[in-house]
From Swiss-Prot:
Protein name: Large ribosomal subunit protein bL27
Region (Disordered): 1-20
The entry's keywords: Ribonucleoprotein, Ribosomal protein
Transmembrane segments annotated in the record for this chain: none
Annotated source species: Prosthecochloris vibrioformis (Chlorobium vibrioforme)
InterPro entries associated with the record: Ribosomal_bL27, Ribosomal_bL27_CS
Length: 84
């Protein structure tokens, strides 16, 4: 006979790493070309003028300028870079 009970198991004890999503450069902030403006899953916010879209749906600046968020077609949010 065992003098200690069995260890048992649990289905808890895991957690995923944080993904650090969200806005990285707020509206009316100055950015350089290549600066990440927004990290997201899917295209909740679309790139507008002078903004590019990465393969993981990251929006980044194509030119030096100022970040400007606006409502585009069908009330979808867009991010523009106004060149400085």
């Amino acid at each position: 006979m065992a003098h200690k009970k069995g260890g048992g198991s649990t289905k808890n004890g895991r957690d995923s790493n944080p993904k650090y999503l969200g806005v990285k450069a707020a509206g009316v902030s100055t950015v350089n070309a290549g600066t990440i403006i927004l990290r997201q899953r899917g295209t909740a916010i679309k790139p507008g003028d002078n903004a590019g879209l990465g393969k993981d749906h990251t929006i980044f600046a194509l030119v030096d300028g100022t970040v400007h968020f606006r409502n585009g077609r069908n009330n979808k949010k867009q991010v523009d870079i106004i060149p400085s």
